[in-house]
Amino acid sequence: MKLNTAVSKRLQGLLAERGLSQYQLSMKSGVPKTTIGNIVNCQYDSTKLRIIHEICQGLGIDISEFFDSYLFCEENLEP
């Protein structure tokens, strides 16, 4: 899968685990809701690490925890 798809799926999973909406995450992280929606809907070819970091802060996790998922295993990602 493409990296943007993995980021999207991971974010969707974290939102579901925490029972948060995109709007709620936007309010907690300071990342615009439209940006979060674009990430979830794979509208970006890539997402800046700074944005992922801000999202992680809103979720209350370290960036390493965000990427600690089978979704980001080398065999799951396209080169």
Regions found by a protein language model. Give the residues of each.
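A short, Lys/Arg-rich alpha-helix, primarily the initiator
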Residues: 1-20
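Conserved hydrophobic/aromatic packing and binding residues within compact polymer-binding modules
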Residues: 11, 25-26, 36-39, 66
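Residues within the helices of the helix-turn-helix
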Residues: 12, 23, 53
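The alpha-helix within a helix-turn-helix
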Residues: 15, 26, 56
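Recognition helix of helix-turn-helix/homeodomain-like DNA-binding domains
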Residues: 31-46
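Short, charged recognition helix plus adjacent turn
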Residues: 38, 67-79
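Short, basic-rich loop-to-helix N-cap that marks the start of a DNA-contacting helix
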Residues: 43-57
